[in-house]
Amino acid sequence: MLSGNGQLDANKWTPFINSQTWTTYILPGLWGTLKSAVFSVILALVMGTALGLGRISEIRILRWFCAVIIETFRAIPVLILMIFAYQMFAQYNIVPSSQLAFAAVVFGLTMYNGSVIAEILRSGIASLPKGQKEAAIALGMSSRQTTWSILLPQAVAAMLPALISQMVIALKDSALGYQIGYIEVVRSGIQSASVNRNYLAALFVVALIMIVLNFSLTALASRIERQLRAGRARKNIVAKVPEQPDQGLETKDNVNVDWQDPDYKDLKTPGVQ
């Protein structure tokens, strides 16, 4: 069927050799994808951190409030959030009409991914040994200091793979903006295919671009994770203090008594030589 429609012909790929195809369709769409993904990921990290910390707060009302927000926006599909935001922004003139689709895409991606990141953060902190928090409190640190200085850095390092996976999801979900007229790489690829009648080639190029983006993001995350682990390993190195001749018998590892020593006296049974 594809060969009958000419989709497998070599001339269907020639438009991608022409720079006009890239400057008119692909590159503007790629910029739209990257722009919406970067903005939404940054806002989702801020939102997720705030909701995640509120989720483990000692204030009960704050915990309930954050839990309601998290569970609500995690349950709503991203596309519905985008359509809702688009209609709301247009109805009340919240954003300029030229930025309407972009704002709706960022809103949908931020609310959904921020809620997921908040739950990832909460579970990451909850998985840490309780002894660390107890030790910090015993040292006189407040609950806030314990969370920011002890628990949060470890939780972020532990949940980094899950965070990167969520960022990849945000990057791919930006393609849903096609439904509300947002110019991103999938929409641009389809527009290019409509002009050149090469749907298979255009979709293949778009898929290849998304694969390269996701692979690059995953590789960057893996490198950051290795650096974090190496940094923690360097911090955990304990230098061994060399023993001094007059150190004395301070630990059981340093005690080496010769039971055949004639000068040894058993303190439990006085008089025994």
Swiss-Prot record:
It is found in: Cell membrane. The keyword Transmembrane helix applies. It comes from the Bacteria. One of its GO terms (biological process) is amino acid transport. Pfam families: BPD_transp_1. It is a multi-pass membrane protein. GO terms for molecular function: transmembrane transporter activity. GO terms for cellular component: ATP-binding cassette (ABC) transporter complex. Keywords: Amino-acid transport, Cell membrane, Membrane, Transmembrane, Transmembrane helix, Transport. The chain crosses the membrane at residues 26-46, 64-84, 100-120, 150-170, 200-220. Its main location: membrane. Residues 262-273 have a biased composition (Basic and acidic residues). Disruption phenotype: Deletion of the gluABCD cluster almost abolishes glutamate uptake activity. InterPro entries: AA_ABC_transptr_permease_3TM, ArtM/GltK/GlnP/TcyL/YhdX-like, MetI-like, MetI-like_sf. SUPFAM superfamilies: MetI-like. Residues 30-221 form the ABC transmembrane type-1 domain. The keyword Transmembrane applies. Residues 242-273 are annotated as: Disordered. Belongs to the binding-protein-dependent transport system permease family. HisMQ subfamily. NCBIfam families: HEQRo_perm_3TM (TIGR01726). Part of the ABC transporter complex GluABCD involved in glutamate uptake. Probably responsible for the translocation of the substrate across the membrane. The complex is composed of two ATP-binding proteins (GluA), two transmembrane proteins (GluC and GluD) and a solute-binding protein (GluB). This is Glutamate transport system permease protein GluD.
